[in-house]
């Protein structure tokens, strides 16, 4: 059990028997009445988001979630297959549990897999990742009518808007939380 005042971003809680990841917490101390925390949580199975209000004096149940470092191997159609880097056992993560994550997975890269009640429920994607640009339209001088960015496709199929000077084959740093270009990366 965890007190409402101790809930922090990144904590995994049980709500109605399901695991939720706290993505945002705002502490509110009204002039009158008890202090409370407004907690925004993401369901770790289906990705739905809900906001809950918890009094700081109340207790909530925290979920026991294990994290395993694993190397991404391949996509078998229904699951993403990883190999635990310590035990070398295969870990299967259902695509239904992690919609949209395939664009951030590269064979051989390591990720943290969250396991709850023996089930792989989430893949922790690093906040910033480097990708190689697989496809980019050429930049034509003076072609700034449409703005100073253009869409490019990375090696994993992720489409990101980047400045016009980015060329095919270059490496770029992407913020995976906002899906935005950060900077060009030199080899």
From Swiss-Prot:
Pathway in which this enzyme or protein is active: Protein biosynthesis; polypeptide chain elongation
Domain of life: Bacteria
Disulphide-bonded residues: none
Listed Pfam families: EFP (PF01132), EFP_N (PF08207), Elong-fact-P_C (PF09285)
Entry's localization field: Cytoplasm
Gene Ontology cellular-component annotations: cytoplasm
Entry keyword set: Cytoplasm, Elongation factor, Protein biosynthesis
InterPro entries for the chain: Elong-fact-P_C, NA-bd_OB-fold, Rib_uL2_dom2, Transl_elong_fac_P/YeiP, Transl_elong_KOW-like, Transl_elong_P/YeiP_cen, Transl_elong_P/YeiP_CS, Transl_elongation_fac_P
GO molecular function: translation elongation factor activity
One annotated GO biological process: peptide biosynthetic process
Any coiled-coil regions, as ranges: none
PROSITE patterns the UniProt entry points to: EFP (PS01275)
PANTHER family per record: ELONGATION FACTOR P, ELONGATION FACTOR P (EF-P) FAMILY PROTEIN
Family: Belongs to the elongation factor P family.
Functional note: Involved in peptide bond synthesis. Stimulates efficient translation and peptide-bond synthesis on native or reconstituted 70S ribosomes in vitro. Probably functions indirectly by altering the affinity of the ribosome for aminoacyl-tRNA, thus increasing their reactivity as acceptors for peptidyl transferase.
Protein name as it appears in the record: Elongation factor P
Species for this entry: Treponema pallidum (strain Nichols)
């Amino acid at each position: 059990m965890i007190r409402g005042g101790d809930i922090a971003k990144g904590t995994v809680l049980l709500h109605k028997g399901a695991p939720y990841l706290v993505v945002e917490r705002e502490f509110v101390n009204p002039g009158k009445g008890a202090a409370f925390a407004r907690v925004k949580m993401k369901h770790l199975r289906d990705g739905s988001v809900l906001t809950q209000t918890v009094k700081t004096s109340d207790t909530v149940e925290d979920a026991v979630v294990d994290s395993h470092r694993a190397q991404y191997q391949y996509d078998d159609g229904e699951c993403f297959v990883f190999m635990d880097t310590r035990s070398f056992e295969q870990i299967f993560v259902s695509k239904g549990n992690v919609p949209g994550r395939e664009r951030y997975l590269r064979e051989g890269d390591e990720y943290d897999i969250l396991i709850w009640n023996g089930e792989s429920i989430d893949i922790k994607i690093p906040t910033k990742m480097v990708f190689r640009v697989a496809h980019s339209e050429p930049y034509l001088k003076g072609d700034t009518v449409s703005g100073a960015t253009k869409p490019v496709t990375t090696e994993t199929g992720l489409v990101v808007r980047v400045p016009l000077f980015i060329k095919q084959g270059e490496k770029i740093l992407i913020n995976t939380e906002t899906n935005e270009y950060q900077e060009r990366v030199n080899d």
